[in-house]
Structures are given as structure tokens and as C-alpha cells.
Amino acid sequence: MTAGKLPGWLKPMNKVMVAIQKLGITAGPVSVLTVPGRKSGQPRSTPMTPFTYGGRPHGVAFPGADWASNARAAGVGTLSRGRKSRQVQIVELSAEEARPVLRVFHDEVPVGVGFMKRTGLVQQGTPDEVEALAGRVSVFRFDPLPN
């Protein structure tokens, strides 16, 4: 597998995770982010593992991830976990802002670091390696919107 190439099983697995969440069943720390598609305008949902930094939820997107392009274009979305949903403003962080967030990602989302290792984004998965991905991976903050 080339460095940064997504595995073929990811899309089917994501569909299963979205379906499970729609039934109101939580699966570990996974949430579903739904944003309008940047071309179609139709809702697009993707599973992700948000984590807290500075008291706010954040998410990390693999290089070239469609959900990141859609989130960037929309600027707003719905973050759901089981039967609970909240509207969020989606703010992309600069590479400099992303560095300390990625260091926390290393500790908070070890499964994400393992995924980065398996796809060749990092070699050992150390905090320094993950932090060095700033500017290569997209990091977003999810600010709650009033109901």
C-alpha cells in the first residue's frame, strides 16, 4: 500500500458504521459527521472519532478525504452519536494551530494513529510524527451552534 492510500475496505466499513449509528447504536467512540455534499448538496455522512482539545471537539481527516472537502465547503454540519445530534460550525485549523491538537490526537485516538501507521502516513506513530503531519492532514474544530 502506498503511503497515504486508503484501504479498499474503508468505504464499505464506513457505510456499515453510518447504518449502525442511524439505528441509534453507538460503536465505541465513533460519531457520524453529516454535511452537504459540495457538488450535489445532498447530505453526506462519514464516521469519525472526535476528541477533545481545549474543551472543544476536534476531528482529523486523512489527506484527500472527501468528507474534509465537503466540511470545508459547507462550514456547518451535524455531529451525531447514537440518538444524540448537534449542529456544529466546522472550523479548519491552520497547520500551526493543528500541531498541538495532533499531539493530543496521538493520545486520545490511538486507533487513528494505528490507521496512520498501517497506511504509511507515519512510521512509528510517535507524538512527534503525528504532530509533524500538520499541514498534510486536515484538522477541524466543531463549535456547537445554538438550537
Locate the predicted segments by residue.
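Covalent nucleotidyltransferase core used to form phosphodiester bonds in nucleic acids
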Residues: 21-23, 57-69
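Short acidic, glycine-rich loop/turn motifs
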Residues: 35-40, 81-83, 144-146
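Short low-complexity stretches enriched in small and charged residues
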Residues: 2-17, 42-47, 94-100
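Alpha-helical membrane-targeting segments
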Residues: 1-30, 107-134
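Short strand-connecting beta-turns/loops that link adjacent beta-strands
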Residues: 53-55, 84, 147
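Short, structured beta-strand-loop surface elements
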Residues: 63-143
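Short beta-strand segments
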Residues: 28-63
